[in-house]
Amino acid sequence: MFEAVEELIGEHADLEKKLADPSVHADQANARKLNKRYAELTPIVATYRSWKQTGDDIETAKEFVADDPDFAAEVKDLEKQREELTEKLRLLLVPRDPSDDKDVILEIKAGAGGDESALFAGDLLRMYLRYAERVGWKTEIIDSTESELGGYKDVQVAVKTKGGQGATEPGQGVWARMKYEGGVHRVQRVPSTESQGRIHTSAAGVLVTPEAEEVDVEIHANDLRIDVYRSSGPGGQSVNTTDSAVRITHLPTGVVASCQNEKSQLQNKEQAMRILRSRLLAAAQEEAEREAADARRSQVRTVDRSEKIRTYNFPENRISDHRVGFKAYNLDQVLDGDLDAMIQACVDADSAAKLAAA
């Protein structure tokens, strides 16, 4: 059933030998790569060995049933255990997203709906900050443009695991959970500015990209155009009298990143480069996916109410994820960061689709 695992066992043994060689660790980047692959294969190898041993134990127990009927109960228990190991191994063999261990850059953009959309973008920001707090992640607002009523026209946040270097265990990074948040989020509610009590519909867009390390993306200095300008706050009010804001354009691709929140031009440049690296990595991955027959759908790039992935209905206290048919009536709790059930529904649907395609 799991013939392909034998090849993985050989690769695992080969990696173990390499990692035991001190000279391998002289190249830290290569050693990290080998360690990562070894950590990915270890649970597969361990589960397969347990699965195989359980099969042998079942055959042995069956041989004793004729002489001692008590072994029939043991056979039943072992068969149940083997079924559980079979399913666990199937899930472990689902093709992994290579970015699942990474931290992310989260961007929320106000869209259709004007001021109400900007206020909703602020609600989404608070929801994600609360979720990160619940699961023990670290957050840092990189750049933001506030609206006049206190919402956000645009906000970018770095979300990291506790160590700030991605996941320590395979598949446990921020991207593994947060990648399902990318798309258009629609809200239905009575705005605070509505005097007639009418329900309005507006939308905000969420873009999630894995945060790239310098080794992930090669950027040449002569491919960049760096512009500096004066920072401004909500309503166009000046918050800085020097040209400290930075906009970086990657000329070969046209990808742009900017930052104005930091106090100095150097700090803004560093943050803008951080965003640019992540966007270039995401663009490269999407291009690879298109060439691989669109194995994973790209995130929504336009904030259009018709392209929604999720609806937040305040009058009914209802949250709906239209991709997986998830629906719950605890919107107040979701907006306070209780996202686990909804995200898990997306994880399960994604795993099922990958299993079916494997």
UniProtKB/Swiss-Prot annotation:
Q: Which domain of life is it from?
A: Bacteria
Quote the protein name from its UniProt record.
Peptide chain release factor 1
GO CC aspect terms: cytoplasm
Cell compartment(s), UniProt: Cytoplasm
Which positions carry the signal peptide feature in this UniProt record? none
User: What does the UniProt keyword field contain?
Assistant: Cytoplasm, Methylation, Protein biosynthesis
Q: Which gene encodes it?
A: prfA
Residues carrying N5-methylglutamine: Q237
Report the family membership. Answer: Belongs to the prokaryotic/mitochondrial release factor family.
PROSITE patterns per record: RF_PROK_I
Pfam families associated with the record: PCRF, RF-1
Q: Which InterPro entries match?
A: PCRF (IPR005139), Pep_chain_release_fac_I (IPR000352), Pep_chain_release_fac_I_sf (IPR045853), Prokaryotic/Mito_RF (IPR050057), RF-1 (IPR004373)
Question: Could you tell me what this protein does?
Answer: Peptide chain release factor 1 directs the termination of translation in response to the peptide chain termination codons UAG and UAA.
Q: PTM per UniProt?
A: Methylated by PrmC. Methylation increases the termination efficiency of RF1.
Q: Report the PANTHER family cross-referenced here.
A: LD18447P
A GO molecular function annotation here is: translation release factor activity, codon specific
